Swiss-Prot record:
Protein name: 4-hydroxy-tetrahydrodipicolinate reductase
Species assigned in the record: Syntrophus aciditrophicus (strain SB)
Family of the protein in this entry: Belongs to the DapB family.
Primary gene name: dapB
Catalytic activity, reaction form: (S)-2,3,4,5-tetrahydrodipicolinate + NAD(+) + H2O = (2S,4S)-4-hydroxy-2,3,4,5-tetrahydrodipicolinate + NADH + H(+); (S)-2,3,4,5-tetrahydrodipicolinate + NADP(+) + H2O = (2S,4S)-4-hydroxy-2,3,4,5-tetrahydrodipicolinate + NADPH + H(+)
Pfam families found in the cross-reference section: DapB_C, DapB_N
Length: 268
């Protein structure tokens, strides 16, 4: 039985992972971590989620429970994830990270830590979204420079980062397939008399409203036709199941930095 620790267990994603963890089979929850000022900190996770006492107290520091776990599933913030990644490397505990918003320097540190422990880092754990990544590469390579590319993402009003990590990953996949540097061609805002659209730019726009779980649309537009690839998430369960799948996979891997394309076998 694989023993799992969930960091960010009081959040929306963490709560769904905990609820689904043992339903998936082969895994047991042994630890939960949440930031010190979170309402869940210090409470029994079962009582906090309304499912009855489970005997697992939500800790405010991963160090209090890391020894009791075989794998860490982290959905926190990029700052907290950096601390958890460092501890995972120190204690040789495989880790799955679903947080987004990492800086270039933080990514360099993650790669360094991953030399000592296997880590799956993915902005989106959904199987459907990761299939879309693969499709985007094929479509972009096939259509080439004759089609304009625009990406639109829509999320709930509480989401803190924009554009979403998933939208940025989609843009990166398309840019690489077209031989472009996203830093040079990414356009994140249009306003005023900006003139004609340049041929190679990739537009990435974000909308925030209500309780929308997540929607991503990639438009390939040319004169006379338009191709759209759309992914809509109706609940967080698809992300949670993907994270659990990644956790079962990562414990069998050698140290290194992986993503969901590796988990799903798309690179083999």
């Amino acid at each position: 039985m694989l023993k799992a620790i969930v960091t960010g267990g009081g959040g929306k994603m963490g709560a769904r992972i905990i609820s689904l963890l043992e339903e998936e089979g082969g895994m047991q929850l042994t630890g939960v971590v949440e930031k010190k000022d979170h309402p869940a900190a210090g409470k029994d996770i079962g009582e906090f989620l309304g499912s009855g006492k489970r005997g697992i107290v939500i800790q405010s520091d991963l160090g209090f429970c890391i020894a009791g776990g075989d794998v860490i599933i982290d959905f926190t913030s990029h700052e907290a994830s950096m601390r958890h990644m460092e501890m995972a490397a120190e204690h040789k505990r495989p880790i799955v990270i679903g947080s987004t918003g990492f800086s270039a320097d933080e990514m360099d540190r993650i790669r360094k830590f991953a030399q000592n422990v296997p880590c799956v880092l993915a902005p989106n754990m959904s199987v459907g979204v990761n299939v879309m990544f693969k499709l985007l590469k094929i479509v972009a390579e096939t259509l080439g420079d004759d089609y304009d590319v625009e990406i639109l993402e829509v999320h709930h009003r509480l989401k803190k980062d924009a554009p979403s990590g998933t939208a940025l990953k989609m843009a990166q996949v398309v840019a690489e397939a077209l031989g472009r540097e996203l830093d040079e061609v990414g356009i994140y805002e249009r306003k005023g008399l900006i003139g004609e659209r340049s041929k190679k730019e990739i537009g990435i726009q974000a909308l925030r409203a209500g309780d929308i779980v997540g929607e991503h649309t990639v438009i390939f537009g040319a004169v006379g036709e338009r191709l759209e690839l759309i992914h809509r998430a109706h609940s967080r369960d698809n992300f949670a199941r993907g994270a659990i799948r990644a956790a079962k996979w990562v414990v069998r891997q050698e140290p290194g930095l992986y993503d969901m394309q590796d988990v799903l076998g798309f690179r083999s």
